[in-house]
Every structure is written in structure tokens, then in C-alpha cells.
Amino acid sequence: MGARKRLRAEKLKSEKNLTALASLNSSPIAPRKMRLVADLVRGVEVNKALNILQHNSKFASKSLEKLLRSAIANWEQKNEGKSIEDEKLVVSSIQVDSAAMMKRIQTAPQGRAHRVRKRSNHVTIIIDGAK
């Protein structure tokens, strides 16, 4: 491996250590409802985001809080000996994607039936040091 390629690889590896990722798959909450809560904490410092999620009354905030705690634990595992407060971690991105839908039938008048789509979502959260 050449010198430039090695330096580039080392730089990418050090940048990768500064970020942490956590994902939640097939959460049984509609993506639209989850996005309402995700928009509150996107781009916010980690401690402030945890505070926002703890005091939010929406059901989706509980699962997002758990996911954020998991991302923090992943970051601590990568960066042993470093403190969250010193690094000023920020929720750099949250992606809420729709997952598989469960299709159910609800009875309707005159012998008909309507389809009910129970939606679920995938959430990916990335935390990063403030720049």
C-alpha cells in the first residue's frame, strides 16, 4: 500500500471512531408518528436530546430514547476513556424509513371489508462529535 493510500485509510479509520451508529428495525409505530419525535432531536446535543425524549409524552419517544442510549453506549465502547461531556456529542442524523406493513381486514357495512394497514418503521441514529 502506498503512503497516500495508507494516510487516507488511517484518516478514515480515525473519523469512523468518532461516530457511533444504532438502529431499530421493525418498530411497530407508524413512520409518520416516529418522524414527529425524530425531528425534535435531530442536530441536538446528546444530553439535551435525552432530556427532550424523557419529557415528551408521545409513545415513540420511549423507543427513540432507548435507541439513543444504545448509540451512546456504542460510542463509549469505541472510545474507551473518553467522556461524552468532553466530546460534546451531537445527534448528527436520524433516518426513519418505513418497514413492512401488516395488512388486516376491518368489517364494513353491507358485507364489505376494508383493508387496514398497520405500519412499522426502521430507525437509524448516528451520533458524532461536535465540529
What residue spans do the PLM features occupy?
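Structured, basic alpha/beta domains of bacterial-type, RNA-associated proteins
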Residues: 2-25, 36, 40, 45-131
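Conserved residues at beta->alpha junctions
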Residues: 28
